């Protein structure tokens, strides 16, 4: 199993909406595929604690849709994270595949989503949550795309109007953070109106 990678970015959060004067930090997680780094994900959790974030942002594929999907490591990780931080989670293609293909996966996705929501995870399935940090309003959006947007070599074209059909319009009163699993569609995310896409 490959090790996890920590990359730090410093971004200036400012727009015509409002400047954020006080710095804050967020941890962004994606594509762990139910991996565990140390017993109970102890290495990953320690690295996250070292960053001292105000919130955790998750852009999917925390589990793997395989013939025998396992979600235990991801559920345990979410349980530890929600003890200390607010967690905002958007599905990736693996979660979506499990959700849609109930013939193959039965109720595995429903059990997974119920478990993480019961722990306090804000699961954003084409939805959003409003958050205020240092008196600045943020809206965190979770974009969930169907499998046609993830097929290798023949992906569907994503447009801002498709995103608007799924999410509605960005909140003009807030700084809009879009959690979207597929980075190739960044131009459509920007046209839709995301101030920051992850």
Can you say where each PLM-predicted feature lies in the sequence?
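Metal-dependent catalytic neighborhoods of phosphoester/phosphodiester hydrolases
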Residues: 38-44, 60-79, 96-117, 190-191
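A general structural motif
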Residues: 23, 53, 84, 173-175
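N-terminal active-site segment of His-dependent metallophosphoesterases
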Residues: 1-77
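Short helix-capping segments at alpha-helix termini
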Residues: 19, 80-83, 116, 171
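Short, conserved loop/helix-junction motifs that constitute active-site signature segments
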Residues: 50-51, 78-84, 190-195
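Generic enzyme active-site microenvironment
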Residues: 28-29, 59-60, 90, 124, ...
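Conserved catalytic scaffold of divalent metal-dependent phosphoesterases
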Residues: 15, 32-34, 95-196
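Conserved phosphate-interacting/catalytic interface
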Residues: 87
């Amino acid at each position: 199993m490959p090790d996890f990678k920590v990359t730090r970015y410093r971004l200036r959060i400012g727009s015509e909406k409002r400047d954020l004067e006080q710095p804050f930090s967020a941890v962004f997680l994606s594509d762990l595929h139910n991996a565990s780094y140390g017993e109970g994900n102890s290495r990953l959790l320690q690295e996250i604690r070292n960053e001292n974030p105000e919130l955790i942002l998750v852009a999917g594929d925390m589990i793997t849709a395989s013939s025998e999907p396992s979600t235990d490591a991801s559920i345990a990780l979410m349980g530890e994270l929600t003890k200390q931080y607010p967690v905002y989670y958007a599905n990736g293609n693996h979660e979506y595949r499990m959700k849609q293909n109930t013939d193959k996966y039965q109720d595995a996705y429903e059990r997974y989503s119920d478990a993480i929501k019961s722990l306090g995870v804000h699961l954003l399935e084409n939805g959003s949550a409003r958050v205020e940090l240092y008196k600045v309003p943020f809206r965190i959006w979770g974009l969930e795309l169907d499998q046609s947007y993830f097929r290798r070599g023949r992906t569907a074209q994503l447009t801002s109007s498709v995103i608007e059909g799924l999410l509605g319009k960005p909140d003009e009163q807030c700084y809009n953070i879009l959690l979207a699993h597929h980075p190739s569609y960044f131009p459509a995310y920007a046209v839709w109106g995301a101030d920051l896409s992850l």
